[in-house]
Amino acid sequence: MTHLQAGLSPETLEKARLELNENPDTLHQDIQEVRDMVITRPDIGFLRTDDAFILRFLRARKFHHFEAFRLLAQYFEYRQQNLDMFKSFKATDPGIKQALKDGFPGGLANLDHYGRKILVLFAANWDQSRYTLVDILRAILLSLEAMIEDPELQVNGFVLIIDWSNFTFKQASKLTPSMLRLAIEGLQDSFPARFGGIHFVNQPWYIHALYTVIRPFLKEKTRKRIFLHGNNLNSLHQLIHPEILPSEFGGMLPPYDMGTWARTLLDHEYDDDSEYNVDSYSMPVKEVEKELSPKSMKRSQSVVDPTVLKRMDKNEEENMQPLLSLD
């Protein structure tokens, strides 16, 4: 075991070996292989290339070097292309702070039986007068940044439960194509987290309709991990034991305290210390120690999968139109 695996329990070490192909004997070589690819994307400012940071991406992609680098590139490209989202990217930012206080997201104290962190969202808590959907996405991304520092969660991953109770048609009408795409790109395509399941409960018909619209834009692996339970909490309990769930989900624990995770972040004054601005992303790519092969040096080679969603032009009016009309 190397110092990079110091935070893992023996059980998680074995899981990383069997499920993620993690090998302590080649760990530093694996990391360097990914780091050496940075020079193939001079259009991106890679603000972090340290061992611990790259390791997150290798674990998220089961130590497939090229896939890990593609995710790393998309991580920084997403931030580079959405600079406004990452200005004041900290828990004390007014929009993020209010979203956190309303439980966007929440985090249960107990892990599930696979060691995964359970995140919860109560959609109806969104107060449109105080913060935006983008603020909610920022709060979720900031929370994931804090949680993913735990090496156990890098290996075991997360589960998300979204309760759609009392989420109104008017609120749903704010979910524009551009907003949904921003969320999909940020969470599915650009973040080194392993999501083992996304559970919808108490979803109304119009949320089911929205899911039908966005489903083609989700990766097959993501689609297989989304479960629409409706009002059938028994089906949820077959996948997540009720002993660790709050009463809102038919569990045996007391009602969830919406401010629990917010207090954790605010007490530690957590923020992402990366400088997300135009200057930082225009800095030259750092020199790497090892020379790359001629094939990997081809600058015309893109690491972005052409099947990944093409980013919408923010000026395209149709992308700002609601998927559900109130008319």
Swiss-Prot record:
It is found in: Golgi apparatus, trans-Golgi network membrane; Cytoplasmic vesicle, Clathrin-coated vesicle; Early endosome membrane. It is a peripheral membrane protein. InterPro entries: CRAL-TRIO_dom (IPR001251), CRAL-TRIO_dom_sf (IPR036865), CRAL/TRIO_N_dom (IPR011074), CRAL/TRIO_N_dom_sf (IPR036273). Residues 96-257 form the CRAL-TRIO domain. Residues 287-327 are annotated as: Disordered. It comes from the Eukaryota. PANTHER family: ALPHA-TOCOPHEROL TRANSFER PROTEIN-RELATED, CLAVESIN-2. Binding to PtdIns(3,5)P2 is not required for localization. This is Clavesin-2. It comes from Homo sapiens.
